[in-house]
Swiss-Prot record:
Required to regulate morphology and anatomy during seed maturation. It comes from Arabidopsis thaliana (Mouse-ear cress). The chain crosses the membrane at residues 7-24. Expressed in seeds, specifically in the embryo. PANTHER family: BCS1 AAA-TYPE ATPASE (PTHR23070). Residues 331-342, 467-502 have a biased composition (Basic and acidic residues). The lineage of its organism: Eukaryota, Viridiplantae, Streptophyta, Embryophyta, Tracheophyta. It catalyses: ATP + H2O = ADP + phosphate + H(+). This is AAA-ATPase ASD, mitochondrial.
């Protein structure tokens, strides 16, 4: 009787011989000849190894964006990883209230679907390059490998993969936490496949109910946002990218950032806070846009201060002139220390970011610009079609005050009629200008013993002080204006006297010659 050990030994020797013969065959036989033997060789290999493998890369080809299929598979496998895998990776979600376990690198688990057994492997490929790299992660690539028997090909390709993607996306929605993103400086990207955005959990409590603004204006903005979020088919019908632009303008402290948070909470969108000064050029700006997801608000705060779009040519020219006078060592030091310090994003690049071809990548995005000085912005940047809705965030009016009083003190007009009437007179009749931020600070209780009456009276005193301060500012401005006019008058007189002296001198010289 043949022993089992001898059987495995003979089988192993046969397989090794086949592999050796196949290698010689591929290397030395002409391609035309191999074409005739290829089907036979594949049949033989299939008989010995009847399994099929499908690879799902994290990044495919030259795409900048991470594969949605890869993400869906990762979410799907996390469902069973905790009970089947031996090596796990833990991630927190929803404010660290729960933990998601997923397969670690080089781990394998099994799955079953309609009686069909499959194997999933999580793999990471490390480049074998021996070159020293300051950014080793740039040479890594991750992928999932699915293995199944060839007899189950139809079930896997037509049913199982669709099941995995569908279930994975459902799990993604269930575990989704809204995030606040910030773009990383480009020198830290370490290759285009690295993280361009860092994020934290978005937990801002602002809502339209707590926003200090007139009720009618708030409802108008809310209706506009809700209409946009439900208009995918409409935007497709009219041939426009599914996006909308909002320009928030007004003095500091009028609630522009709070408005953005309220918008995100209303629509349950992520927020991308884009810092333009860290973006090197238009190409990097496009890459950042590609990495944003749908259902998101892309914010550029203080757009008038983010980039000097009008003065870049002069700055570049000055730098080129200075470069000739710089030694090679100094040039390299400047390059290492501040290569990305000066952004080369242009106005045309920013406009293309808003409504060019690249703005159509993805969908359901809101782009928000904020500024304290709308007059400083290029008209091309804020025209309708780019910034579709202009929202002025003004000083606190009486309607906005009532919202703040209710938020901070649970105070209502009918309960504190006299104090409310005085505040109404100061805000509407006296037209005293105070930002919602300053009003809120005066309404905030500073200790447990303070009552709402004390806080309301403190606000009244602050409004009266603001009135006096406004008068002083006007007087100072008038005084300064008069002083400037006096200086100009004296300069004109001095100029006139010098001119007369010059003419008199020339006249005397002419007389002496005669």
């Amino acid at each position: 009787m043949v022993k089992m050990g001898e059987v495995w030994t003979n089988t192993g020797s046969a397989l090794a011989s086949l592999v050796f013969i196949y290698t010689i065959f591929e290397r030395f036989f002409p391609y035309r000849l191999r074409e005739h033997f290829e089907p036979l060789a594949q049949s033989l290999i299939g008989f010995i190894y009847p399994y099929i493998q499908i690879t799902f890369h994290e990044y495919s080809g030259e795409r900048f964006k991470r594969s949605d299929v890869y993400d869906a598979i990762q979410s799907y496998l996390s469902k069973d990883s905790s009970s089947r895998a031996k090596k796990l990776t833990a991630n927190t979600i929803k404010g660290n209230k729960s933990i998601i376990l997923s397969m670690d690198d080089h781990e394998e688990i099994t799955d079953e679907f309609q009686g069909v057994k499959v194997w999933w492997q999580s793999k990471k490929h490390q480049s074998e390059s021996r070159a020293i790299s300051f950014y080793p992660k740039a040479d890594e690539s991750r992928f999932y490998m699915l293995k199944f028997h060839r007899r189950d090909r139809e079930v896997i390709t037509k049913k199982y993969l669709n099941h995995v993607i569908s279930e994975g996306k459902t799990i993604e929605v269930k575990n989704r936490e809204r995030k606040l993103y910030s773009n990383n400086p480009s020198q830290n990207w370490s290759g285009y496949k690295q993280t361009k955005w860092s994020h934290v959990t978005f937990e801002h409590p602002a809502t339209f109910d707590t926003l200090a603004m007139e009720y009618k204006k708030k409802e108008e903005i809310k209706n506009d946002l809700i209409k946009f979020s439900n208009s995918k088919d409409y935007y497709k019908k009219i041939g426009k990218a599914w996006k909308r632009g909002y320009l928030l303008f007004g003095p500091p402290g009028t609630g522009k950032s709070t408005m953005i948070a309220a918008m995100a909470n209303l629509l349950e969108y992520d927020v991308y806070d884009l810092e333009l000064t860290t973006v090197k050029d238009n190409t990097e700006l496009r890459r950042l846009l590609i990495e944003t997801s749908g259902k998101s608000i892309i914010v550029i705060e203080d757009i008038d201060c983010s980039l000097d779009l009008t003065g870049q040519r002069k700055q570049k020219k000055d730098e080129e002139e200075d470069e000739d006078e710089t030694s090679p060592i100094e040039k390299q030091m400047k390059k290492d220390q501040g290569e990305n310090k000066g952004s080369k994003v242009t106005l045309s690049g920013l406009l293309n970011f808003i409504d060019g071809l690249w703005s159509a990548c993805g969908g359901e995005r809101i782009i928000v610009f904020t500024t304290n000085f709308i007059d400083k912005l290029d008209p091309a940047l804020i025209r309708k079609g780019r910034m579709d809705k202009h929202i002025e965030m003004s000083y606190c009016g009486f309607e906005a005050f009532k919202v703040l009083a209710n938020n901070y003190l649970d105070a209502k007009e009918e309960d504190d009629n006299e104090l409310f009437d005085e505040i109404k007179r100061l805000l509407e009749v006296e037209e005293i200008k105070m930002t919602p931020a300053d009003v809120g600070e005066n309404l905030l209780k500073k200790s447990e013993v303070e009552t709402k009456e004390i806080c309301l009276k403190r606000l009244i005193e602050a409004l009266k002080e603001e009135k006096e301060e406004a008068k002083r500012r006007i007087e100072d401005e008038e005084k300064k204006k008069k002083e400037e006019e006096e200086i100009k008058r004296k300069k004109r007189e001095e100029k006139k006297i010098k001119k007369e002296e010059k003419e008199e001198k020339e006249e005397n010289e002419t007389t002496m010659k005669d």
